[in-house]
């Protein structure tokens, strides 16, 4: 049987943190096992890196990413799609700071991606600012050799007003030379805080999907852009101590073949997608593992 070596690198890192990581106190009071400075790499050309050693909440991955892309910071919009992964953050943020109304997460990812530099007032307001996503798409189409295609979520001016400052902070996109009539789009993500149990599997899938979407909408009649690699740099790599039992089970599982992804909506407008446009094929994961989110 072929071993899924790409998922195996994630499992190897889990094992390293579990058995070699140092014990640390943390903001949540739960405690963690920690290592610092690791990297994973996934080939997006023929498969999609949705982990198989536990079932990953695919609907949540897609809807959260589309919510980020829309620029929304209103958790009720995500709730309407049946996704409640930000609800506890919203409740805690409102209780502790009460800066905005209860469903408002502050100037988190979507706001930074689409309205960078604007003064955040609330989730119901209209904003201008720098549309980083559209700038990246335009650059891919017009100057694919450019080395400044960066998507930034980290904003020191705004971090204190966010329900949670960005864990995945900076994504750098790179376009290859033309090979066999097409170019490849790769993404390198820097993640300052990497929760190996809950966050990282989600983040891998999310930025792999974002790379697929940007490649899709950046393609033109004369220039085909396809996904290349996803490189994931993890800075503070940690496992919460209340996740150890579940993750010990996960590393005992033999990874299966990754699924594939098809985008069936042929439009080139990044704001015009729905979750139905992304078809995941041949996803055969092990059962989900229960882990509580640390706040």
From Swiss-Prot:
Which Gene3D superfamilies does the record match to this protein? Thymidylate synthase/dCMP hydroxymethylase domain (3.30.572.10)
The EC code for this enzyme is: 2.1.1.45
One example of the protein's molecular function in GO is: thymidylate synthase activity
Q: Which InterPro entries match?
A: Thymidate_synth/dCMP_Mease (IPR045097), Thymidate_synth/dCMP_Mease_dom (IPR023451), Thymidate_synth/dCMP_Mease_sf (IPR036926), Thymidylate_synthase (IPR000398), Thymidylate_synthase_AS (IPR020940)
* Keyword Transport (UniProt): no
Positions of (6R)-5,10-methylene-5,6,7,8-tetrahydrofolate binding: 195, 294
Q: Enumerate the CDD domains for this protein.
A: TS_Pyrimidine_HMase
Question: Which residues of the sequence carry a binding annotation for dUMP?
Answer: 27, 147-148, 192-195, 203, 238-240
Keyword RNA-binding in record: no
Swiss-Prot/TrEMBL catalytic activity: dUMP + (6R)-5,10-methylene-5,6,7,8-tetrahydrofolate = 7,8-dihydrofolate + dTMP
Give one GO biological process term. methylation
**Which SUPFAM superfamilies does the record associate with it?**
Thymidylate synthase/dCMP hydroxymethylase
Note one Pfam family from the annotation.
Answer: Thymidylat_synt
Which residues catalyse the reaction? 167
Q: Which UniProt keywords apply?
A: Methyltransferase, Nucleotide biosynthesis, Transferase
Pathway stated in the Swiss-Prot or TrEMBL entry: Pyrimidine metabolism; dTTP biosynthesis
By sequence similarity, the record places it as follows: Belongs to the thymidylate synthase family.
What name is this protein filed under? Probable thymidylate synthase 225R
Organism equals Invertebrate iridescent virus 6 (IIV-6)
């Amino acid at each position: 049987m072929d071993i899924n070596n790409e998922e195996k690198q994630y499992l190897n890192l889990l094992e390293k943190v579990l058995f070699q990581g140092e014990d640390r106190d943390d903001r949540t009071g739960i405690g963690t096992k920690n290592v610092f400075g690791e990297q994973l790499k996934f080939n997006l050309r023929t498969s999609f890196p949705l982990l198989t050693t536990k079932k990953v909440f695919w609907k949540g991955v897609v809807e959260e990413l589309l919510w980020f892309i829309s620029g929304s910071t209103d958790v009720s919009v995500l709730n309407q799609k049946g996704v409640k992964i930000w609800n506890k953050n919203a409740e805690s943020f409102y209780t502790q700071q009460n800066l905005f109304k209860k469903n408002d997460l502050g100037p988190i990812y979507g706001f930074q991606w689409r309205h960078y530099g604007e003064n955040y007032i609330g989730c119901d307001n209209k904003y201008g600012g720098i549309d980083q996503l559209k700038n990246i798409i335009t650059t891919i189409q017009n100057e694919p050799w450019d080395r400044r295609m960066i998507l930034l979520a980290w904003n020191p001016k705004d971090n204190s007003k966010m329900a949670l400052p960005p864990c995945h902070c900076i994504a750098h996109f790179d376009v290859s030379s033309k090979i066999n009539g097409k170019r490849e789009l790769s993404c390198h993500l820097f993640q300052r805080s990497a929760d190996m149990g809950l966050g990282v599997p989600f983040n891998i899938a999310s930025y792999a999907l974002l790379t697929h979407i940007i490649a899709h909408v950046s393609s033109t009649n004369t220039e085909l852009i396809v996904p290349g690699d996803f490189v994931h740099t993890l800075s503070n790599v940690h496992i919460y101590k209340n996740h150890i039992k579940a993750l010990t089970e996960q590393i005992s599982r033999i990874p299966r073949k990754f699924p594939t992804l098809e985008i069936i909506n042929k439009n080139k407008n990044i704001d015009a997608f729905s979750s139905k446009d992304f078809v995941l094929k041949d996803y055969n994961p092990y059962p989900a593992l229960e882990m509580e989110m640390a706040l």
